[in-house]
C-alpha cells in the first residue's frame, strides 16, 4: 500500500522556525549551508508555517532551497494557520500567497495548524477541512493532515470526524510522554488506533532537554558520548508509529550534530532507555514536570 512517506528519505526533518538570524533578518548564507548539509546527508523533509519568523521562514526557503534545488529534491510541508483566516473565502488566497512565498506550485504536506478544541470548531464552521481536501484533489497538496496541541480525547474526536486525515503532528518528547497537560503518549496511542502516521515536533522541548539540570546531565554523561539532543530525538524516533521527527535547528553546528546521529538511525538501546527514565525521575523530583500520580 502506498504511504504518504514513500518519497521521504529518512525519519528526520528540518523544522524552519528557528533559522539563524542576522539582526532581524534571516541569515541566508548560513541557512543555505544548513540546507546543503541536510540534503547532502540524505535528508529531504522541510517544515514551515507562515507565522514562523514573521513570514521570513517561507521566504528563506525560497531563497535557500526551492530556487536552488529541483522540486523532486525536497519534501515541503506548510500549514493553514488560524491567525490569518476568518472565513472560508480567506483560505485559497492565503494558500496561494504561501505557494508564492515558498516558490513552489504545490506542497507535499499541508497541515491544519495547531488544532485544539476551539480552533477545530472554527475550522469546521468555515469548512476549512473540505477546502483543503479540495486543494488536495486539485493537486496543489499531495497529503493533508493536522498539527495538534490538546488532550487526546480531542484528537480522537477530530480523527473520528475526519478519517480522511493522512498524518498527525504532535508534541512528543521523553518529559512530556506522561505529562498530564500534553499527553504525548495518549495522543500517540490515539494516532495508532486510527492508523495515522505521526510527525513529532518539540522532541527537545524547545531546548529544555538540551540544557539539563546538573543531576540529569550526569546521568547522560555516563552514556557513550552522544549529545543531549541526540538522546531526545532518538527517543521519539524509536517509536514504530513515528515516521518523522522535526528539529528546529538554528546553526550549522546543530545541523552537523543532528545529521550525524540520524543519518544511520539507531533506536535507543536498553541502557539509554534506562538513563532517560532516570532523567525523567530527576525532572519529576525537582518539580520540573508534573507527577502523573
Residue map of PLM features:
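Structural motif corresponding to the early beta-alpha repeats
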Residues: 52, 68-88, 113
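Short beta->alpha linker loops
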Residues: 52, 56, 149-150, 250
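Conserved, mostly hydrophobic/aromatic
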Residues: 14, 38, 46, 61, ...
Amino acid at each position: 500500500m502506498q504511504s504518504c512517506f514513500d518519497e521521504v528519505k529518512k525519519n528526520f526533518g528540518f523544522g524552519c522556525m528557528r533559522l539563524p538570524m542576522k539582526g532581524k533578518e534571516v541569515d541566508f548564507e548560513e541557512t543555505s549551508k544548513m540546507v546543503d548539509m541536510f540534503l547532502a546527508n540524505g535528508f529531504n523533509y522541510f517544515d514551515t508555517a507562515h507565522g514562523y519568523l514573521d513570514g521570513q521562514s517561507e521566504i528563506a526557503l525560497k531563497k535557500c532551497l526551492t530556487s536552488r534545488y529541483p522540486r523532486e529534491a525536497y519534501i515541503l510541508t506548510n500549514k493553514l494557520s488560524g491567525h490569518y483566516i476568518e472565513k472560508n473565502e480567506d483560505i485559497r488566497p492565503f494558500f496561494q500567497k504561501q505557494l508564492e512565498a515558498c516558490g513552489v506550485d504545490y506542497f507535499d504536506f499541508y497541515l491544519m495548524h495547531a488544532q485544539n478544541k476551539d480552533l477545530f470548531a472554527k475550522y469546521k464552521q468555515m469548512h476549512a477541512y473540505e477546502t483543503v481536501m479540495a486543494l488536495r484533489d486539485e493537486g496543489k497538496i499531495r497529503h493533508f493532515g493536522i498539527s495538534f496541541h490538546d488532550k487526546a480525547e480531542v484528537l480522537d474526536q477530530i480523527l473520528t470526524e475526519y478519517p480522511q486525515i493522512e498524518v498527525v503532528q504532535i508534541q512528543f518528547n521523553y518529559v512530556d510522554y506522561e505529562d498530564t497537560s500534553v499527553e504525548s503518549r495518549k495522543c500517540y496511542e490515539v494516532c495508532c488506533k486510527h492508523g495515522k502516521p505521526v510527525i513529532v515536533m518539540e522532541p527537545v522541548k524547545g531546548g529544555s532537554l538540551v540544557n539539563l539540570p546538573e543531576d540529569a546531565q550526569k546521568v547522560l554523561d555516563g552514556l557513550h558520548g552522544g549529545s543531549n539532543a541526540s538522546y531526545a530525538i532518538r527517543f521519539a524516533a524509536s517509536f514504530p508509529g513515528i515516521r518523522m521527527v522535526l528539529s528546529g535547528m538554528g546553526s550549522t553546528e546543530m545541523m552537523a550534530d543532528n545529521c550525524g546521529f540520524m543519518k544511520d538511525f539507531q533506536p535507543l538501546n536498553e541502557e539509554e532507555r534506562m538513563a532517560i527514565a532516570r532523567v525523567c525521575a530527576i525532572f519529576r523530583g525537582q518539580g520540573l514536570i508534573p507527577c502523573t500520580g
